[in-house]
UniProtKB/Swiss-Prot annotation:
The lineage of its organism: Bacteria, Bacillati, Bacillota, Bacilli, Bacillales. Residues 18-57 bind DNA. Belongs to the transcriptional regulatory Rex family. It comes from the Bacteria. Its main location: cytoplasm. GO terms for cellular component: cytoplasm. This is Redox-sensing transcriptional repressor Rex. GO terms for molecular function: DNA binding; DNA-binding transcription factor activity. SUPFAM superfamilies: NAD(P)-binding Rossmann-fold domains (SSF51735), Winged helix' DNA-binding domain (SSF46785). Modulates transcription in response to changes in cellular NADH/NAD(+) redox state. SMART domains: CoA_binding. Keywords: Cytoplasm, DNA-binding, NAD, Repressor, Transcription, Transcription regulation. Signal peptide: none annotated.
Length: 215
């Protein structure tokens, strides 16, 4: 399914988790079908965009009927690899890393942090939220043992690149980078940068220059 996903526009790919989360809620609520208009209201994406997004995957719904919730939930679960558990490692257990350890990823999907790494003697060897914290020196071995291909990076910026180089040697394929460093990786490795300061600055800019329309 991942090969199919790579053929769709990136903007569509980014919206798939939104659809999946709401469809999971509908399924758990016992709802059997949903229209694009209902989805639009819930996820705040216009219905024409939703229909176009869904069209990339073939005929998922019927005109006048809408979409079968159970069917498209199962379809998107496979597309997003949510039909199996994805093991993730957290690199860096500072303030942000600790907060992420306490976030229940398994509540709405099959993403699980299976190991965390740090150099602080007070943290190494401890267990937080049932997640063991190992010394950074053991990172490559533990990552391989747990079949981890995706990591969350929250180390200090000046340690980011050397840490990433080691992760690549351990066959990591995806990095969610919370550091301000712009890291270099081979083309087969995917990096998503999450810079909270930049996101806030962007939000403030849009608030000041493109105020939301009032009714």
């Amino acid at each position: 399914m991942m090969e199919e996903t790579t053929k769709i526009p990136q903007a569509t790919a980014k919206r798939l988790p939104l659809y999946h989360r709401y469809l999971k809620y509908l399924d758990e609520s016992g709802k059997e079908r949903v229209s694009s208009a209902e989805l639009s209201e819930a996820v705040k994406v216009d219905s024409a965009t939703i229909r176009r997004d869904f069209s990339y995957f073939g005929a998922l719904g019927k005109k006048g009927y809408g979409y079968n919730v159970s069917y498209i939930l199962d379809f998107f679960s496979k597309t997003l690899s949510q039909d199996k558990q994805t093991n993730v490692a957290l690199i860096g257990v500072g303030n942000l890393g600790t907060a992420l350890l306490h976030y229940n990823f398994m509540k709405n999907n099959n993403i699980k942090i299976v190991a965390a790494f740090d150099v602080d003697p007070a943290k190494v060897g401890s267990v937080q939220q049932d997640i063991p914290i190992y010394h950074l020196n053991d990172m490559e071995e533990i990552v391989r043992e747990n079949g981890v291909e995706v990591v969350i990076l929250t180390v200090p910026a000046d340690e980011a690149q050397v840490t990433v180089d080691r992760l690549i040697e351990a066959d990591v394929k995806g990095i969610l980078n919370f550091t301000p460093a712009r890291i270099s990786v081979p083309k087969q490795v995917r990096v998503h940068h999450i810079d909270l300061t930049t996101e806030l600055q962007t939000l403030i800019y849009f608030l000041e220059n493109y105020p939301a329309k009032t009714e």
